[in-house]
């Protein structure tokens, strides 16, 4: 059973209804998008409710000038006391299918570098930011 179930890449009301219904039927933790928000235009206070916890979403990987380090600094400048702040990443390997079909080629590799950068870990530790898994939400 997956830790969570979501589909932020597609923006269709019917799609989100179907995703939520499927998650309910199969007892999966569902994470949609904040009402009235699109995946590429989330406002800084956009959140979803996951098991009674406000989850504030940050995803800028589809923006032309995307820089995960800059996104992290935005998140750190706007931390929320009433929930958790979550950056959404798409790191991973690049295979033939992804190379031919994905619009996230550069962001994928940039996110791998960012997520494995010891300076990022040190910055979060310095600020006493606790990293949690989605299972904990």
Residue map of PLM features:
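Active-site glycine- and acidic-residue-rich loops that bind
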Residues: 9-14, 57-78, 111
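Catalytic domains of cell-wall/extracellular-matrix polysaccharide-remodeling enzymes
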Residues: 1-52, 63-64
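Aromatic-lined glycan-binding groove of carbohydrate-active enzymes
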Residues: 74-95, 130-132
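C-terminal domain-boundary segment and adjacent tail
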Residues: 30, 101-137
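Substrate-binding/catalytic groove segments of enzymes
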Residues: 98
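A general structural detector for well-ordered alpha-helical segments in enzyme core domains, enriched
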Residues: 19, 71-75, 120
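Conserved, mostly hydrophobic/aromatic
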Residues: 5, 87, 124
């Amino acid at each position: 059973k997956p830790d969570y179930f979501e589909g932020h890449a597609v923006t269709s009301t019917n799609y989100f209804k179907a995703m939520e219904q499927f998650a309910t039927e199969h007892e999966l933790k569902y994470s949609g998008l904040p009402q009235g928000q699109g995946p590429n235009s989330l406002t800084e206070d956009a959140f979803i409710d996951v098991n009674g916890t406000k989850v504030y979403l940050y995803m800028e990987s589809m923006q032309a000038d995307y820089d995960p380090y800059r996104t992290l600094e935005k998140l750190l400048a706007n931390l929320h006391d009433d929930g958790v702040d979550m950056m959404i990443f798409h790191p991973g390997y690049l295979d033939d299918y992804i190379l031919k079909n994905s619009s996230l080629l550069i962001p994928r590799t940039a996110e791998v570098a960012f997520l494995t950068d010891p300076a990022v870990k040190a910055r979060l530790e310095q600020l006493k930011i606790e990293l949690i898994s989605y299972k904990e939400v």
